[in-house]
A protein has these predicted regions:
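Domain-scale activation on soluble regions of proteins
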Residues: 154, 161-175
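N-terminal leader/capping segments at the start of a protein or of a new domain
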Residues: 1-46
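Asparagine-centered strand-capping/turn motif at beta-strand->loop junctions
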Residues: 141-145
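Short acidic-glycine-tyrosine-enriched beta hairpin
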Residues: 111-139
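A short glycine-rich, His/Asp/Glu-containing loop-to-beta-strand
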Residues: 52-82, 129
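A short hydrophobic beta-strand segment most commonly corresponding to one strand
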Residues: 96-98, 146-162
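Glycine- and acidic-residue-biased ligand/ion/polar-headgroup-sensing regions
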Residues: 93-110
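Conserved short histidine dyad/triad with adjacent acidic residue
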Residues: 76-90, 134-136
Length: 175
């Protein structure tokens, strides 16, 4: 994809326009993440942003699908079947996410060098939005609900070009 690629999604334009305006202000990663989170809270799309088939997810693991990509940010849907989870990881850039359905249970960690220290947990429910920026963004996410979970993630990078929002996967003991 080139500098800006809109993947036709009815209803996405108000979110794209708002994020473009915020990103153009060059507020810094953490402030950008929090400002985009405020916008996403007001403009979080509904389930109809995905087709019924896309909302089914996959039995093989959660599915990330780019909805919009630009050199400065990407909008990605993530679909999780019950019990599906990520590995422990951090990100290449700031991130904001909003929950459309399901419950995303997030466990937060701090890298202590030879191990990870669990520093928090949160259950993110439909309508809830959060944002963060590296460093300090190490987490694992799991759909703990009995239904398919759908969330919208906004990353401060072109993940269609990078292939992923993940910077590093952590395989350290947790204490």
């Amino acid at each position: 994809m080139n500098a800006a690629t809109a993947l036709a999604r009815p209803g996405l334009e108000p979110l794209v326009t708002g994020i473009s305006d915020i990103v153009s202000r060059r507020l810094g990663p953490r402030r950008t993440a929090y400002t985009v989170a405020d916008l996403l809270r007001d403009r979080l799309p509904g389930l109809d942003i995905l087709t019924p088939q896309e909302r089914e997810g996959s039995p093989d693991g959660y599915v990330s699908r780019p909805l919009y990509a630009h050199e400065d940010f990407s909008i990605v849907s993530v679909v999780w079947r019950p019990g599906q989870e990520t590995v422990i990881h951090d990100h290449v850039a700031w991130c904001t996410f909003g929950i459309i359905s399901g419950i995303e249970h997030e466990t937060l960690y701090r890298d202590m060098g030879d191990h990870l220290l669990e520093i928090g947990r949160a259950d993110n429910r439909p309508g809830e939005v959060s944002g963060f920026a590296p460093p300090g963004d190490i987490h694992m996410v799991r759909n703990t609900s009995g239904e398919i979970g759908v969330s919208i993630h906004v990353y401060g990078a072109d993940v269609s070009r990078l292939g992923s929002s993940v910077r590093r996967v952590y395989d350290l003991p947790v204490r």
